[in-house]
Amino acid sequence: MKVAVTGTPGVGKTAACALVRSLPVRNVNDLAVEFGAVKGYDRRRRTKEVDVRRLARAVARLEGDMIIEGHFSHSLGVDLAIVLRCSPRVLAKRLEAKGWSAGKVRENVEAEAVDVILVEAVEGVPEVCEIDTTRRTPLGMARAIDAICRGEREKYPVGNVDWSREVLSWF
């Protein structure tokens, strides 16, 4: 089984996956480099441009169960997507603390507020769970990921995270 741990940048994917014990973890950016799927660099966004189709073909050839961690890992033909979610207000603070530009913070907070990655995962992955990371420690997130990978998915259904009240309070 290939499992994506995905979510908007800043929700805690990398910190959580560093503590996961149920399956080996591969980082989506490392896989892109390993399989020659990096096609350029977006200077404005300060990020690698990845040929997702090429990377998905390479991931399909990988053997064994694994977690693929990264904000577009749900686009790689995985069996299960675990979407990590975070309050847009908290996410903004996290990204600002990382020194991200105001534009990049806004872009990612808006994406989280309107469920961009969750919708993509639901549309393209056979099974999806979501975890609210707002008040969880990395260890707490890792334990939830491990539980989901062991089949304990009923606590983490799609739709259990809703930022609509928070978003409406912005107006």
What feature does the model see in each segment?
Residues 39-40, 86-129, 135:
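A glycine- and Lys/Arg-enriched "phosphate-lid" helix/loop adjacent to the NTP-binding pocket
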Residues 123-171:
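NTP-dependent small-molecule kinase module
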